[in-house]
Amino acid sequence: MRRKADNTGRRPRLGLALSGGAARGLAHVGALKVFDEHGLRFDCVAGTSAGALVGGALASGMPFGEIEKIGRSLRWRDLGRMTVSRLGVQSNAQLEEYVRARFPVSRFEELPTPFAAVATDLRTGAAVVMRDEGDVAFAIRASCAVPGWYVPVTDGRGRQLVDGGLVANLPVSVVRALGAEVVVAIDVNFEGAKFLGPPASVVGVLLQSMLVGQRTAVAHQRQLADVVLSPAVGHMRWDEMGRAAEFIEAGAEAARAAMPAITELLEPQPEEGQGWFNLRRARDRQPLKD
């Protein structure tokens, strides 16, 4: 997409925030496909859980074709293995190995695009934002460690880290902290618990329980974004990795619908008195009353 700019040539720093959502996070891949087709490039990316995996791949400079290939072939067996532990059913160390083997770079310092992954400190309940330095694969693993299913991940400071979705499932404020002036957020859980039937696995039960606790925080983060995409994936469960093609298409449809709004935000609006771009959200543009 051609970005318009004022006579200084400056453009807003564009950020992308990707939510967690287990298999539903594959919808992020479809959105990236449309962004890639339009030549849209992000200056910084933040992701939680599944969003950290997809966002990390994007920030690493991985070609989109490879991201899509991974998204369509990814299975639960790639992410974890059964383990003997009182703290979880599986270890997701395999996910760390998977990422390290496929990403073009392995450390935050080497990423061509600034990136942050969010985890949760199990002892304090605080968000742990991993950025700037350290191991990207480890950060993604920690961000994806669904509590109760995966064993918590212990970092170099002795903190037990679990899925960032507990405290920041849609990390809009995190990508703002990376310097984003315009933020596109993708929330794959907007439709909540609407799906066909009850959870079909322990993972589904755990993820749905997390979603209930996330709703207030996510609603606030949605308000902080300039454009929010909500792919229509509510009829598919969080554990249905085999429906990758449907998740990806849902993400692509949401991105196509959002492209006009994104384009408008990146255009200069001198008549608005804001210089080189218009930050007003479409939902705030109401006709004036007499």
What are these regions (language model features)?
Residues 1-48, 56-290:
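Patatin-like phospholipase
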